[in-house]
């Protein structure tokens, strides 16, 4: 994998709630492939000592900070202090890796992610995560702006 020196990895929403009950039966082979691929990319960034930023979705227990998620079929999820909100074991942050908590689909909305990326002089992002049609999509779109 060819990566520049100003590249960072965003590991988006790979959390216990989404993956703690993961089996081939309930996720299927494509999901396992996705998770294994995310780990391979993470291993490359770690080996090259490039910045890794873990994005964690977390909502207040009284639900005041939920957005459009509750308009659809998602329901309550990723509540602060819930074991399911913790990072998944497969991609758990190591010491020295960054963490950003978000409350919306995009990792940029209402967070300090842009400040962190500027401080690290990042000009290229690689994104991995489990929900590519929502959180990866919105984070990538906001990164492009």
Where are the regions a protein language model picked out?
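Short, glycine-rich nucleotide/cofactor-binding loops
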Residues: 26-31, 126-133
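Acidic, glycine-rich active-site loops and adjacent beta-strand->loop/helix elements
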Residues: 58-59, 105, 131-134
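Active-site acidic carboxylates
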Residues: 1-93, 98
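Short Gly/Thr/Asp-enriched flexible loops that form oxyanion-binding sites at enzyme active sites
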Residues: 136-145
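Internal catalytic-core helix/loop-beta-alpha segment
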Residues: 82, 88-130
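Hydrophobic residues within alpha-helices
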Residues: 38-41, 113, 139
């Amino acid at each position: 994998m060819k990566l520049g020196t100003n590249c960072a990895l965003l590991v988006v929403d790979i959390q216990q709630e989404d993956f703690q009950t993961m089996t081939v039966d309930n996720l299927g082979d494509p999901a396992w492939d996705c998770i294994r691929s995310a780990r391979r990319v993470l291993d490359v960034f770690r080996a090259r000592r490039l910045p890794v930023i873990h994005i964690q979705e977390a909502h207040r227990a009284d639900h005041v900070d939920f957005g459009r998620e509750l308009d659809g079929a998602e329901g309550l999820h990723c509540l602060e202090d819930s074991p399911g909100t913790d990072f998944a074991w497969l991609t758990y942050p190591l010491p020295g890796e960054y963490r950003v908590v978000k409350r919306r689909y995009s990792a940029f909305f209402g967070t300090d992610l842009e400040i962190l990326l500027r401080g690290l002089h990042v000009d290229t992002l690689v994104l991995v995560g489990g929900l590519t049609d929502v959180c990866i999509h919105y984070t990538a779109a906001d990164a492009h702006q």
